[in-house]
């Protein structure tokens, strides 16, 4: 059967039309910013917008749905950024075709319709398709083999291959408990000329068999004990990657050869002047324009925090690849028009936002190009002279001063076969982050010349307020209005937004007035009673005097107050566990985590950390009510409340009682300790002499952290073919095996070197009564070189010897001089003479010295020069 060529637009329309004809409601793609899952950075699958339906907390007016969902994988757990441009199928942005049944049809219809669409509509050759099913799912197996007619040898049963019951590539779980069920994946066979084996085989990671469609059958509910019971209304969730399907239907092997990427790559070629359409940098640019444009359309502008920072990383990665192609001026934003022409029909919001997207990307380009060339020069200089690892402090300087995200520097190093000291980068980041953050905010806010009245803060009681704009600042200057796309600061007469203070981050949210929407990314104090709402006007126009609906982001506020209240409980627990000397030295509380610095002169033990966690979680389980009372300072002192570091107190203060903790605090907090949900310490470290730092997470973030750890343990256990409870013993066994093998290898190297040493004696040349030998030893390490050197010195008696070995591009050199000859020849001088010719240096004693080098290509010539050098010394 000849497969017809479908364009990407054809594939989308055909898919939606097919399922619409089967009674499905066509649902538009949701935003890349999930509206119902604060733990998820970006929408990464079609089912995200239906998650609440599957969980039973939402009900739609339809029971069958189909969509083409815009997805992004470039941050958090799901992150493909570093692979984009280097492989045939990795993308930041991609489209997911899907169909869903909410308690309506089930396996039979789902699989039969999938087969019908693939073979009868898209005309894929049936003999090229195979399927997998969960090993125990006889129903799906029978549908494939007995009803659809797929030969049994092309239906593969996959069991629990992930280290536990129901832990399988073919058993899907939304979480550790809740809806779950088997799945059936459809694969396309590219043919035996492509390396790789079928799913479930040792070679399954090859490119021959490519998964194109996954049908998930949610038919069970998983309890905490791991048991499953049937759901009263089973559901279907399917997903098929549009780009992968397009590559098959368009008879190409790489996603970057399909029509939409072909057009974008040609547009990138036009703007950069790069004629080689297969250049990886053009692929990177073509991929990244899709991701960045859709993110701007969905309200994510480049920034230094959260989703905005992921956006900035993607934009700057694309710009750097343009620079690599010789483009030294802004070009990336010019591709928006091409993208809108290609995808605007399918995503009308993209076409409508094209002008705004262009302006946002152009502004970011202009900002980065100001420092890009200087930064690249610094990076090039740091990587000169045979350096194999970019120092962490250099990577941080590039990040902090020149706006180079770490992965951009890593990308440059990767192209040159080098790496980045990421641990060193993190150390430098931690040392300067708080100071840089404080300095930046001080400059920003002090630049605002505000002399008006203060505002009323209502955020303890309300998260939404009708307010009046009393001042606007654009680029640090007072303005009468803000227009769409402008960054600015807005001051309100009344606000529910909490301004950063006492270590708690400022609120995020939005200000709405008619069609105007101002996205608040941070709230900072201009003066003690004047709050500046920092952000970007996404739509419309705002003027001084306008009334707005000020709406705090409820999810971010809730996560922040959980962390803040937990910080108070943790402070009390630390004093109980470590001693009364524990005093707060600083803190940072935001929606992601709490970071708490305190006086203590030794690292916390594991037992102490566990005890603090236990005490805090006990307070959470007690579900005690919190109480905040305003009183004068004298009355507050009588209550015994602790005063917090970094907080300036007035005549009237706020005493917060939460659990057994009592402190002065003006921040926002939970109503009851149980609202915190869960508390987990994730890091403990030293930040200065006598100061320790604890980082912790709460609520959903704590759950996500524990689930990630559990996943890591399960994955490691699966790799080592052990249960999680057996993992520690199994690791010990593997380490013992490694040690035994290392001893065996060392012994074999010694035998090999010894045998080579006997042969090398015959190569020694007599120079004025001194035996001179310069030779290579194959497969030797530094230890073997030294041992062989000692044996040769014993046998040759009066001698000068140089031995060298090569491991990849690295060179190890040993120079030895017998004790009766060190007055004439020094081993240290000799080893440096040889090492200097292979890009290295070394040192040692008069009779033995070692060196390393990086240029193995010149080693033979260096060894040949030894005889002349020794002769000149005699």
Curated annotation (Swiss-Prot):
One of its GO terms (biological process) is negative regulation of DNA-templated transcription. Its EC number is 6.1.1.7. Keywords: Aminoacyl-tRNA synthetase, ATP-binding, Cytoplasm, Ligase, Metal-binding, Nucleotide-binding, Protein biosynthesis, RNA-binding, tRNA-binding, Zinc. It comes from the Bacteria. Catalyzes the attachment of alanine to tRNA(Ala) in a two-step reaction: alanine is first activated by ATP to form Ala-AMP and then transferred to the acceptor end of tRNA(Ala). Also edits incorrectly charged Ser-tRNA(Ala) and Gly-tRNA(Ala) via its editing domain. InterPro entries: aa-tRNA-synth_II/BPL/LPL, Ala-tRNA-lgiase_IIc, Ala-tRNA-ligase_IIc_anticod-bd, Ala-tRNA-synth_IIc_core, Ala-tRNA-synth_IIc_N, Ala-tRNA_ligase, Ala_tRNA_ligase_euk/bac, DHHA1_dom. It catalyses: tRNA(Ala) + L-alanine + ATP = L-alanyl-tRNA(Ala) + AMP + diphosphate. The keyword Phosphoprotein does not apply. It is found in: Cytoplasm. Belongs to the class-II aminoacyl-tRNA synthetase family. This is Alanine--tRNA ligase. Its cofactor is Zn(2+). Its main location: cytoplasm. Binds 1 zinc ion per subunit. NCBIfam families: alaS (TIGR00344). Zn(2+) binds at residues 564, 568, 665, 669. PROSITE patterns: AA_TRNA_LIGASE_II_ALA (PS50860). One of its GO terms (molecular function) is aminoacyl-tRNA deacylase activity. GO terms for cellular component: cytosol. Consists of three domains; the N-terminal catalytic domain, the editing domain and the C-terminal C-Ala domain. The editing domain removes incorrectly charged amino acids, while the C-Ala domain, along with tRNA(Ala), serves as a bridge to cooperatively bring together the editing and aminoacylation centers thus stimulating deacylation of misacylated tRNAs. Gene3D superfamilies: 2.40.30.130, 3.10.310.40, 3.30.54.20, 6.10.250.550, Bira Bifunctional Protein, Domain 2 (3.30.930.10), Threonyl-trna Synthetase, Chain A, domain 2 (3.30.980.10).
């Amino acid at each position: 059967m000849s497969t017809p060529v479908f364009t990407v637009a054809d594939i989308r329309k055909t898919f939606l039309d097919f399922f619409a004809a089967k009674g499905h409601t066509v649902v538009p793609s949701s935003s890349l910013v999930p509206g119902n899952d604060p733990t998820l950075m970006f929408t990464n699958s079609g089912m995200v917008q239906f998650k609440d339906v599957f969980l039973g907390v939402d009900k739609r007016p339809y029971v069958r749905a189909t969509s083409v969902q815009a997805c992004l994988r470039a941050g958090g757990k799901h992150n493909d950024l570093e692979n984009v441009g280097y492989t045939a199928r990795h993308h930041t942005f991609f489209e997911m075709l899907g169909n869903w049944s909410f308690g309506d049809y089930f396996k039979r219809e789902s699989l039969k319709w999938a087969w019908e669409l693939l073979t009868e509509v898209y005309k894929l050759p049936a003999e090229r398709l195979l399927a997998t099913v969960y090993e125990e799912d006889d129903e799906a197996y029978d549908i494939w083999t007995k009803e659809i007619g797929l030969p049994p040898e092309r239906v593969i049963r996959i069991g629990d291959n992930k280290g536990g019951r129901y832990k399988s590539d073919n058993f899907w779980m939304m979480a550790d408990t809740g809806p779950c069920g088997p799945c059936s994946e459809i694969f396309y066979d590219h043919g035996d000329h492509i390396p790789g084996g079928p799913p479930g085989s040792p070679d399954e990671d090859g490119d021959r068999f490519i998964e194109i469609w996954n049908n998930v059958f949610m038919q069970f509910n998983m309890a905490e004990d791991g048991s499953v019971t049937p759901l009263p209304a089973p559901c279907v969730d399917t997903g098929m990657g549009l780009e992968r399907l397009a590559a098959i239907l368009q008879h190409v092997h790489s996603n970057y050869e399909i029509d939409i990427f072909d057009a974008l790559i040609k547009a990138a070629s036009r703007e950069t002047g790069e004629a080689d359409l297969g250049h990886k940098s053009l692929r990177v640019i073509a991929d990244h324009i899709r991701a960045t444009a859709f993110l701007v359309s969905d309200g994510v502008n480049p920034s230094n925090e959260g989703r905005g920072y992921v956006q900035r990383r993607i934009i700057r990665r694309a710009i750097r690849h343009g620079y690599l192609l010789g483009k030294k001026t802004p070009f990336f934003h010019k591709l928006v028009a091409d993208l809108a022409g290609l995808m605007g029909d399918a995503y009308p919001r993209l076409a409508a936002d094209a002008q705004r997207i262009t302006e946002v990307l152009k502004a970011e380009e202009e900002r980065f190009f100001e420092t890009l060339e200087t930064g690249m020069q610094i990076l090039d200089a740091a990587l000169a002279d045979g350096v194999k690892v970019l120092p962490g402090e250099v990577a941080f300087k590039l990040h902090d001063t020149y706006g180079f995200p770490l992965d951009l520097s890593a990308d440059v190093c990767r192209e040159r076969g080098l790496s980045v000291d990421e641990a060193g980068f993190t150390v430098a980041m931690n040392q300067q982050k708080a100071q840089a953050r404080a300095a930046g905010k001080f400059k920003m806010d002090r630049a605002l010349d505000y002399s008006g009245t203060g505002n009323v803060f209502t955020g303890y009681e309300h998260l939404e307020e009708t307010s009046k704009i009393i001042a606007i600042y654009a680029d640090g200057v007072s303005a009468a209005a803000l227009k769409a796309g402008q960054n600015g600061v807005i001051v309100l007469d009344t606000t529910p937004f909490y301004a950063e203070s006492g270590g708690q981050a400022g609120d995020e949210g939005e200000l709405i007035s008619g069609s105007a929407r101002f996205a608040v990314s941070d709230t900072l104090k201009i003066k003690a009673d004047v709050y500046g709402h920092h952000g970007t006007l996404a739509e419309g126009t705002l003027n001084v005097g306008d009334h707005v609906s000020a709406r705090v982001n409820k999810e971010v506020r809730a996560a922040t107050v959980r962390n803040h209240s937990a910080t108070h409980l943790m402070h009390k627990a630390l004093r109980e566990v470590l001693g009364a000397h524990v005093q707060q030295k600083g803190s940072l509380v935001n929606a992601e985590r709490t970071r708490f610095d305190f006086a203590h002169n030794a690292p916390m033990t594991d037992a102490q950390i566990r005890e603090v966690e236990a005490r805090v979680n006990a307070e959470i389980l007690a579900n005690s009510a919190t109480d905040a009372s305003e009183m004068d300072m004298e009355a507050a002192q009588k209550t015994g409340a602790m005063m917090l570091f970094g907080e300036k107190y007035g005549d009237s203060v706020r005493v917060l009682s939460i659990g057994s903790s009592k402190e002065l605090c003006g921040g926002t907090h939970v109503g009851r300790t149980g609202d915190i949900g869960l508390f987990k310490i994730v890091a403990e470290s030293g930040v200065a002499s006598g100061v320790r730092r604890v980082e912790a997470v709460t609520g959903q973030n704590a759950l996500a952290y524990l689930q990630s750890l559990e996943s890591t343990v399960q994955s490691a256990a699966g790799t080592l073919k052990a249960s999680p409870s057996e993992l520690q013993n199994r690791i010990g066994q593997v380490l013992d095996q490694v040690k035994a093998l290392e001893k065996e290898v060392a012994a074999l190297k010694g035998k090999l070197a010894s045998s080579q040493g006997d042969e090398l004696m015959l190569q020694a040349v007599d120079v004025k009564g001194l035996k001179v030998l310069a030779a290579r030893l194959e497969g030797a390490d530094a230890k073997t070189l030294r041992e062989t050197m000692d044996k040769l010195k014993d046998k040759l008696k009066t001698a000068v010897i140089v031995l060298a070995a090569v491991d990849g591009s690295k060179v190890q050199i040993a120079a030895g001089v017998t004790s009766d000859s060190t007055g004439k020849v020094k081993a240290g001088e000799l080893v440096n003479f040889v090492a200097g010719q292979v890009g290295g240096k070394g040192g040692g004693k008069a009779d033995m010295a070692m060196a390393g080098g990086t240029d193995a290509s010149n080693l033979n010539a260096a060894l040949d020069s030894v005889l002349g050098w020794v002769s000149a010394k005699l």
